[in-house]
Swiss-Prot record:
UniProt PTM: The C-terminal propeptide is autocleaved.
Organism for this UniProt entry: Arabidopsis thaliana (Mouse-ear cress)
Gene Ontology molecular function terms on file: serine-type endopeptidase activity
Enzyme class: hydrolase
Peptidase S8 domain boundaries: 116-589
EC number(s) given by UniProt: 3.4.21.-
Protein's name in the database: Subtilisin-like protease SBT4.4
Residues the record marks as active site: D144, H204, S528
Alphabetical keyword list: Autocatalytic cleavage, Glycoprotein, Hydrolase, Protease, Secreted, Serine protease, Signal, Zymogen
Stored SUPFAM superfamilies: Subtilisin-like
Amino acid sequence: MAKGTTFIFLFSSLLVLSLSSVSADKDDHGDQQVYIVYLGSLPSREEYTPMSDHMSILQEITGESLIENRLVRSYKKSFNGFAARLTESERKRLAGMERVVSVFPSRKLKLQTTSSWNFMGLKEGIKTKRTRSIESDTIIGVIDSGIYPESDSFSDQGFGPPPKKWKGTCAGGKNFTCNNKVIGARDYTAKSKANQTARDYSGHGTHTASIAAGNAVANSNFYGLGNGTARGGVPAARIAVYKVCDNEGCDGEAMMSAFDDAIADGVDVISISIVLDNIPPFEEDPIAIGAFHAMAVGVLTVNAAGNNGPKISTVTSTAPWVFSVAASVTNRAFMAKVVLGDGKILIGRSVNTYDMNGTNYPLVYGKSAALSTCSVDKARLCEPKCLDGKLVKGKIVLCDSTKGLIEAQKLGAVGSIVKNPEPDRAFIRSFPVSFLSNDDYKSLVSYMNSTKNPKATVLKSEEISNQRAPLVASFSSRGPSSIVSDILKPDITAPGVEILAAYSPDSSPTESEFDTRRVKYSVLSGTSMACPHVAGVAAYVKTFHPQWSPSMIQSAIMTTAWPMNASGSGFVSTEFAYGSGHVDPIDAINPGLVYELTKADHINFLCGLNYTSDHLRIISGDNSTCTKEISKTLPRNLNYPTMSAKVSGTKPFNITFQRTVTNVGMQKSTYNAKVVKFPGSKLSIKVSPRVLSMKSMNEKQSFMVTVSSDSIGTKQPVSANLIWSDGTHNVRSPIIVYAMS
């Protein structure tokens, strides 16, 4: 990533917090920057001490005997490496050392439920299967902004001691205590040990942790909204917290430390609601590298797909060994009505808890309240330093964007009505606000132009039913992957809009300086919220199948997902929006067949992407090599639960996908292949063989799918579904073929 200023977006309660940061941090050491020095796997010899080795390397490169201020992190548990402050010339010398696998800058990353689990069918009661004793031995590692340990969602009432496999520690720092629910905590953000604390000061980490594994807490709500029982997917599971994010963002070198510790601590699933601001190659992606090491020892990494949709090729979680999650809306939404002076009611979206008591306030358009120093276009957007306080004080301000809402409140506005850029989600603000659709916003402007004294009031929010759910959220990042064209990303979709979950009272629900509210539960949106839903489902599946590998769990969730849709046309409305579909926790525990992958399969896949042996080792951390034969591996033949290929849109093509399934259903079963094509499909799809006869558990059988067509064009991907059915199980795999101009 190029040096310079990037923006980090923290999706806390629908608030976009913009923070300026430098991609490779410069500090007080002149032109030194923080780099991650990756040395691969840990040597097996007993006398090897990583820390001493890392310090020795630094002393050799820098020529300095005292290098404590240079060494930032030492990775010494699950893989080998360190982070250090280096000059450019020192970086080059390090990169040239034979034993150094790679040196890359520590980048900034960004942070990206009362009804959501019920919506997915995972309801509490006798109809939902649970194995509490095994669930209690399950540990979810949450890499995020910390946690508020005093929340009822993390009470350890009824919990026994941590599982025997737990090897971690509670290093939460000052004002932080672990218990038998939150069994581990570490902080990587503090500049000194004295300031270390895993406490969550943004609310984001608390929210995500409770979605994955929070206790069932009755009467949870946000000022009465969303009232119900908030709980995680596996309420009896344990939580280990790894704080890598603060108000300056999330450092890549801290992320690597979190992976190093989490893997060694013994977690079963890792949930990361954090994404890079750009899309680096795997060998420079701390999540991809850390997750590869996790996968190699049986730990599944679940990652948010990103919040940069609906633009195509914005999904940042692209490695096939990382479970990438898109966000969907559920069957519940929040609205805030706007009542005009003439009695007309407009339906807006908002999580508004403020009551105007039915009082009508004067309306003023931002562009009509502009300072002379500001252009009308900027004032129309209510941009900072554009509004005249005398003209907005005591009024409801109309804004064409959210940019100046805090400014309007600061100048004395009593509320605001905003043109909604994302009509499928509601926002929390620090004073009365309603977000209107384009049509309703035009109606409001028309009303203002038709009367001398336009007035309105904004009502408190109400809950409404969303009959269109599940539907992919507009903001959810889309594929196809810009790194790997023949792997469908994102993988799966889960609830990520207006999710009520635990929150940290150490932060306001909007992080606005004017917001004095402190809450125990709040409503947030983003793929950050979708990610822990899938982490919870993965942990739930693992309680029934403790010996399953990460790829088996991922396959079970993907092949049992609900088919779904996305609004719009072209790429943004296809599987590149929602992957395999919407997660179904109940069916995922009994998939029938799974597509299994090993570390060796992923290495062959990387070789097929033309990775050299040197680049391969950056990710694998071992002595793997790419031979000529292995390098002929087609990436689309990775044994993935979906099938995707990029082709020429104007020429005939004939491509094949090779797959192998493992029987995890009934000992003796016969699966028949069925191809479901959409109306008007130009694809010819053949499956060989069309029948798979399984005679034993864990038996593997292979098949080939051949897809051909004269041409498909470049505007609309063409897709179908392959379903293997034995009458009980329906193992569904999307097939998508596309071309891009």
